[in-house]
Curated annotation (Swiss-Prot):
The keyword Protein biosynthesis applies. GO terms for cellular component: cytosol. It is found in: Cytoplasm. One of its GO terms (biological process) is cytoplasmic translational termination. InterPro entries: Ribosome_recyc_fac (IPR002661), Ribosome_recyc_fac_dom (IPR023584), RRF_sf (IPR036191). PANTHER family: MITOCHONDRIAL RIBOSOME RECYCLING FACTOR PSEUDO 1, RIBOSOME RECYCLING FACTOR. Keywords: Cytoplasm, Protein biosynthesis. The keyword Transit peptide does not apply. GO terms for molecular function: ribosomal large subunit binding. Belongs to the RRF family. CDD domains: RRF. It comes from Janthinobacterium sp. (strain Marseille) (Minibacterium massiliensis). This is Ribosome-recycling factor.
Length: 186
């Protein structure tokens, strides 16, 4: 491993932490309906747990209602049950082959809970980024011990990794501010 490898690995891992945070924040419900709410719902399809998007067409009907249309008629009841049991606080209603999923408006108390959840997810992401920084710095120390790089190179690389860490922490903070605004908007 070289100094460049250590920096590249740290950058890739930090980017992955950001992607994970974005995915986690997408699961957090806001006052508006969006199809991302149902992205992680799993449906029993021919004995296998399958992602909802694989067995049904998920669309927005209006600002507060999601429409789910299974590709097969026999899947309507199964999909409705999966949505109901997904612990999202949603109560789907079937109209023929279309399942309407109204998203109830969030109470003020629930909004505050969501903001706490968002902040908790962000803190986890920051911890992950800092752990990646620590691992990268340890890799650099090993390189110095193995005489693969000088102490000056190590210091420069540590500074660059710190700048990288700061950049990703700022990005996490921006994502949190956006999501909080989204959650608190009535």
């Amino acid at each position: 491993m070289t100094v460049a490898d250590a920096k590249k690995t740290a950058d890739q891992k930090m980017q992955k932490s950001i992607e994970t945070l974005k995915a986690d924040l997408a699961k957090v419900r806001t006052g508006r309906a969006h199809t991302g709410i149902l992205d992680h719902v799993m449906v029993e399809y021919y004995g296998n747990p399958t992602n909802l998007s694989q067995v049904a067409n998920v669309t927005l009907i209006d600002a507060r209602t999601i429409g789910v249309q299974p590709f097969e008629k026999k899947m309507v009841a199964v999909v409705e049950k999966a949505i109901r049991e997904a612990d999202l606080g949603l109560n789907p209603a079937t109209q023929g082959e279309l399942i309407r999923v109204p998203t109830p408006p969030l109470t003020e108390e629930r909004r505050k809970e969501m903001v706490k959840l968002v902040k908790s997810e962000a803190e986890d992401a920051k911890i992950a980024v800092r752990n990646i920084r620590r691992d990268a710095n340890e890799s650099l120390k090993k390189l110095v011990k193995e005489k693969a790089c000088s102490e000056d190179e190590e210091r420069r690389a540590q500074d660059e990794i710190q700048k990288l860490t700061d950049k990703f922490v700022i990005e996490i903070d921006k994502l949190v501010v956006e999501k909080e605004k989204e959650v608190l908007t009535v």
